[in-house]
């Protein structure tokens, strides 16, 4: 891995609360505390193993595909020039080499399907080079942004709340031990491996207790029900069947076969050998300009042919299901909306994003 320069990506300042500044390492270690890093670490090790396997196979990288992926990234982040990209990377402790290596590694993941054997390495015991490669992947994949948001929400909750009760902190300590699968006597060793101390752990427990206290107050049954009414249409679940066709004429012909001849969608697809599949989604998942088409069509009816890529899709609505709080996905989305709205406002008062390299 190429050097990231004089500033490690671990040391970039990502947010501040009061006079205290927090680094990328703080956000990552907080994710370790919450038990949210392990899956990302395992995925990263798989990516590294795929890259190593590609080297063993002497796989020729598709530079065009890698370049397209990098350009799409720059477009999403509004990085028009090379100078803007370099500044964006430098502010995060990264270089163009890190940038290029990341997209080459992602290509290897998609190109190598067999013979990939990730190493069994714990995050806390990995060497610095591997860890900094991991941080680069967290930054470029957007995963670090999510960790920063989760940290700032908790910092804001801590600042806005009274000192958590000892019972609440004790409850978080029990959850922490359960998440890690360790005994109280093993905590000191765990902290040493992470490079933290008991003061840090106590602060994490207090922050989490304050955050959970806010969440419990916010996610009362009445609040969920009010939010459900506001999101009734967007959280309507659609079950559809669709056929993929090569042209508008073919789509219109298939439409007539269903409407006029009484054939099923699957029969039309089988007869003409068109791809056929079922799909489920919430209305809010569709682009805004596509939503009215689905709202205006009754259950059991077909939509007019829809352009999709180089061809068209013919879609029939099998079922429309109104949202209910008993649906775990609906409930999760409602709770996430409530949390995002509340903590977005709270963080403007107490915690502030501050992405920069330390001076």
Where are the model-predicted features located?
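Peptidyl-prolyl cis-trans isomerase
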Residues: 1-12, 20-359
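Short aromatic-centered micro-motifs
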Residues: 15
């Amino acid at each position: 891995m190429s050097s990231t320069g004089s500033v490690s990506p671990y040391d970039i300042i990502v947010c501040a609360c009061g006079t205290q500044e927090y680094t990328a390492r703080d956000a990552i270690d907080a994710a370790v505390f919450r038990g949210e890093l392990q899956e990302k670490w395992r995925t990263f090790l798989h990516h590294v193993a795929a890259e190593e396997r590609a080297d063993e196979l002497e796989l020729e990288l598709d530079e065009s595909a890698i370049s397209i992926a990098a350009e799409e990234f720059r477009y999403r982040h509004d990085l028009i020039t090379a100078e803007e990209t370099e500044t964006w990377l430098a502010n995060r402790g990264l270089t163009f080499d890190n940038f290029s290596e990341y997209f080459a590694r992602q290509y290897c993941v998609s190109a190598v399907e067999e013979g990939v054997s990730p190493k069994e390495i714990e995050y806390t015991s990995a060497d610095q080079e591997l860890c900094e490669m991991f941080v680069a992947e967290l930054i470029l994949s957007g995963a670090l942004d999510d960790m920063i948001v989760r940290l700032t929400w908790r910092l804001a909750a801590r600042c806005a709340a009274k000192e958590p009760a000892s019972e609440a902190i004790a409850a978080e300590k029990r959850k922490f031990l359960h998440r890690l699968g360790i005994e109280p006597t093993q905590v000191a060793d765990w902290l040493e491996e992470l490079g933290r101390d008991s003061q840090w752990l106590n602060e994490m427990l207090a922050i989490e207790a304050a955050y959970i206290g806010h969440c419990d107050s916010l996610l009362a049954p009445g609040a969920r029900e009010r939010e459900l009414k506001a999101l009734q249409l967007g959280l309507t679940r659609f079950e559809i069947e669709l056929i993929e066709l090569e042209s508008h004429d073919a789509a219109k012909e298939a439409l007539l076969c269903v409407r006029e001849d009484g054939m099923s969608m699957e029969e039309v697809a089988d007869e003409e050998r068109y791809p056929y599949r079922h799909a489920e989604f919430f209305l809010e998942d569709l682009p805004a300009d596509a939503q009215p088409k689905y709202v205006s069509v009754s259950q059991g009816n077909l939509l007019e042919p829809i352009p999709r890529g180089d061809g068209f899709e013919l879609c029939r609505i099998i079922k429309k299901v109104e949202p209910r709080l008993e649906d775990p996905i609906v409930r999760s989305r409602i709770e996430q909306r409530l949390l995002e709205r509340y903590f977005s406002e709270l963080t403007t008062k107490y915690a502030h994003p501050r992405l920069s390299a330390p001076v």
